[in-house]
């Protein structure tokens, strides 16, 4: 099987790397090197030039997002699930994303939408949109699902830091789910008030904390480090 240009995770004993299989090339780490021509299947194990065993496999969404090259701060995987559920995104959705950023959330939304969905992603920075386009095509090219045919990237500023300003020149008149991802509580107060004033119901404000546990035999304990506050998720629903 030809794995040319296949996006993969190469996992050594100490680190994970995101790479693309390229015929005739080698992947070099401080634990040795491997030849991409030796990759015959996925997943598989390969012995490096120093005798170390490397695992090679297709990246999950979480692995890809955390290891990819990025510009602006990403929305972390722990928050993505809550955002998608709050927005009720499915294969028939029409989605407007304000603030493309590095494309982490854009990617996951795109993977959920169907061929008849509509998806518009706005950003004032064209570099962000170019980066996001590469991010999405690079990840989804690993698969062949019936995902959305096209994402329409629009170069426009709708004030990501002040989402309440959206309602100054726009009016919601169809059933709509709204989700904002914000770093500060002062922003949360303003957008929640604005949603209330513009007819939104079921307004929720939450933040997601993620703490892993270690389980070894009869001993169980939480890990000493955890992923705490990364942003507030504010959601609401406009019902006619």
Where are these regions (language model features)?
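N-terminal auxiliary segments of SAM/dcSAM-dependent transferases
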Residues: 1-58
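Conserved SAM-binding loop and adjacent beta-strand
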Residues: 67-80
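S-adenosyl-L-methionine
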Residues: 122-164
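Short beta-strand element of Class I
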Residues: 116-120
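C-terminal substrate-binding/active-site "lid" region of AdoMet-derived donor-dependent transferases
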Residues: 167-232
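Conserved SAM-binding loop of SAM-dependent methyltransferases across substrates and taxa
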Residues: 102-115
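Conserved class I S-adenosyl-L-methionine
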Residues: 90-101
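Glycine-rich helix-loop-beta junction characteristic of Rossmann-like nucleotide cofactor-binding loops
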Residues: 85-90, 112, 170-171
